[in-house]
Amino acid sequence: MKLIIGLGNPEPRYDGTRHNVGFEVVDRLASSFQAPFKAGKGKYHEAKCSHRGESLLLVRPTTYMNHSGQAVMAAMQFYKVKRQDMLVICDDLNLPVGTIRLRAKGSDGGQNGLKHIIQQMGTNEFSRLRIGIRKGDMPPGSFSSFVLGKFDEEERKVIDRVVETSADAVLDFALNGIEHAMTQFNKTVA
């Protein structure tokens, strides 16, 4: 079983925000497999599906971003998933809109959901798919208001394609592993 965690904030007011792009990817996968989300065995919702014989557990934490590690640990422990079989999907303020980066391990890069997962797990050695949300002309002021803001019309067109490509990258990870997915999907989606 592969554990696929999309990060975001749980309230409807955060739907469509930059910070919730991880949710958009797992939602896209769940929709394509007609797999409804239901309450999980911890602070998360889950959807189960299968792709070419590989079981996938899609997870949406019901905690806020800064406490995502609670959901990750609960799902890992309940389903006895090893960290090499887990992929976390999140936004990345350090990457421009349209960029996808898969990594087998690494720092949190200032992403608080990743930071909490690393703290809870005691390691940064787990796969992640980062989706760029940075604008070329970053507005002055708080980064939190930026990440909690919605994409503008042009960005939304790009992000819709990025979500689709990211869903394909998740399926590649599930079948072929992180190294293969990195060679195929680390790119900018125009």
Swiss-Prot record:
EC number(s) reported in the record: 3.1.1.29
Record site feature (Discriminates between blocked and unblocked aminoacyl-tRNA), residues: 9
Sites where the protein binds tRNA: 14, 64, 66, 112
PROSITE patterns according to UniProt: PEPT_TRNA_HYDROL_1 (PS01195)
One GO-annotated biological process of the protein: protein quality control for misfolded or incompletely synthesized proteins
CDD domains: PTH (cd00462)
Primary residence: cytoplasm
Annotated site residue numbers, Stabilizes the basic form of H active site to accept a proton: 91
Family: Belongs to the PTH family.
Name of the protein this chain belongs to: Peptidyl-tRNA hydrolase
Species the sequence originates in: Chlorobaculum parvum (strain DSM 263 / NCIMB 8327)
